[in-house]
């Protein structure tokens, strides 16, 4: 029995993009975008962690909903945040707030990147037609 040839699955690209930022684009063969997105999103996460003194991604915080959009790297940083939080967290510090915001933006950005990977595979020819004048 011959099955029709299918390309990469958009759902797999979406899930891979959540686990590792940019992996959905790598799965689709867009290596340049994959590297760019991985570096940008992971860089935002690390910059936010450094700014916030390593205590910005913690369980039980509302911000984790946004930060969790960055997927695997965000959840991998939770034990580090827990370790640094044992010595106390300066919740009112501007650097802590800015670091928290950076990590949340990384999560939201990764959600957009995941949607891009999904849409490029689900609708490969959308937007390529020129409008008739």
Identify the residue ranges that each predicted region occupies:
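Alpha-helical transmembrane segments and their helix-start/interface "positive-inside/aromatic belt" motifs
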Residues: 30-38
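Hydrophobic, membrane-inserted alpha-helices
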Residues: 17-22
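Transmembrane helix recognition focused on a "late"/terminal membrane span
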Residues: 1-14, 37-133
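Active-site beta-strand/loop microenvironment that shapes enzyme catalytic pockets
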Residues: 23-31
